Amino acid sequence: MGDKESRASYLLAMPETTLTDRALLRIAGDDPRGFLQGLVTQDMASVVPGAPQWGGLLTPQGKALFDFMLWAEGDAILVDCEASVAEALARRLSIYRLRRAITIERSEGAVHWAREGGEGVPDPRLPALGQRWIGDAGAAAKGWLAHRLSLGVTEGLAELGSDQTLWLECNARELNGVSFTKGCYVGQENTARMHHRSKVNRRLVVAPLGEAGDRTRATYPELGLMVELRRVEALGDARVPDWMAAALA
């Protein structure tokens, strides 16, 4: 069997687990943890091998710009983010680098997901989301989007927006995406104020919609703001997810 045939057989045998819309940034150099500690919503002390954490980079007003997973890789940190915004995120982080000897660059490898199984570690936002790990790229995962939305979990630029949605309105508190004990970071003041006053007036929720005619309903403030219409089969009835109901009880 030739090299091309061998490679084709190998790829066909690989499980369909790669999240092809994700990319990895590697932050290394002079204390990357300390660099990120003053920027992101997550406490970098909790980012240890085998325990990635979900967090965000906010505006000074506490609105989401980027969300991502943070992975420990030796002394470096891997940022698992949307591929479409990876370059923009790298540029944004570089603004804060100043003269610190920090490198921010694309990393090889791919992000993988499986709904269940022994591979990887539980998604830090919600264990029901499944397992997540980093490895060589393979066949594209199937079912991730529908599974995530069926659990009422939002992520990414299209759903969270950029400088549109306050971080706690993204359900960051309920999905373990913020530390209230770590100290200062960009957007911390407004985020902490909302938390301590227990005042989150709006929240992102996932609800199935009908055909395009239902788009007009989103123009009425009393019905809420629809950030994006996505067609996904078998989402089920609109409801407050169990994890959110339990957190708000």
Language-model segments: what does each one mean?
Residues 2-249:
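Basic, glycine/lysine-rich polyanion-binding surfaces/domains
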